[in-house]
């Protein structure tokens, strides 16, 4: 339908529209709005999952008779640092390639005492370890912790080489916690932890 408007009607219509729009705006600004209160959600960092292996554990010293002809160097040419180095048997090469950082999972208090295992004597010497050496090919499913033969421990009132005090421990759980560049081998436990953080 066609509606004819006179000039005066046009002015009145414009005024009406302006009033309607203004009224709607005022109504919107004075009408209380309902806002849903949302509690902030705290993001929990995802815990890393670690690969574990159950192995035998022994210890060695960087001295002739326990290593090859270069006791001051590991099989990959790294300095034989008793603070961070561990060796592994050849059959574990795929699971624990050089540069893998492992931790020894503490024994449960309910674990029966193994008379051939002296973990309790050297526990504070282990820390984190970098796989940086290899063992005799005949040995299987074993990690070998490099320890300082001069840092003696007390066993039954007698001072002993820590590698001998450890003996052989069976069913030891180790956990892979990272990997580092063996060409930038840390020198201390503190440096190793820092290198591990930077590699993540």
Put a short name on every predicted segment.
Residues 1-5:
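Juxtamembrane low-complexity tails/linkers enriched in Ser/Thr-Pro and polybasic
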Residues 6-9, 16, 27-200:
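Solvent-exposed, well-ordered loop and adjacent helix/strand elements within mature globular domains
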């Amino acid at each position: 339908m066609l509606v004819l408007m006179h000039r005066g009607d046009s002015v009145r219509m414009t005024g009406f529209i302006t009033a309607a729009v203004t009224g709607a705006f005022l109504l919107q600004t004075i009408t209380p709005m309902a806002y849903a209160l949302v509690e902030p959600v705290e993001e929990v960092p995802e815990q890393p999952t670690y690969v574990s292996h159950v192995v035998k554990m022994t210890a060695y010293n960087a001295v002739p008779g326990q290593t090859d002809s270069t006791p001051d160097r590991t099989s990959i040419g790294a300095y034989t640092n008793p603070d961070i180095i561990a060796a592994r048997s050849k059959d574990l090469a795929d699971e624990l390639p050089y540069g893998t950082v492992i931790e020894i999972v503490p024994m449960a208090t309910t674990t029966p005492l193994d008379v051939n295992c002296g973990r309790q004597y050297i526990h504070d010497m282990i820390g984190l370890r970098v796989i940086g050496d290899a063992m005799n090919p005949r040995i299987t499913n074993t990690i070998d912790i490099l320890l300082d033969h001069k840092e003696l421990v007390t066993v039954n009132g007698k001072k002993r080489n820590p590698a001998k005090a450890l003996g052989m421990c069976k069913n030891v759980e180790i956990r892979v916690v990272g990997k580092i560049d063996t060409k930038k081998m840390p020198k201390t436990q503190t440096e190793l932890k820092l290198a591990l953080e930077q590699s993540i």
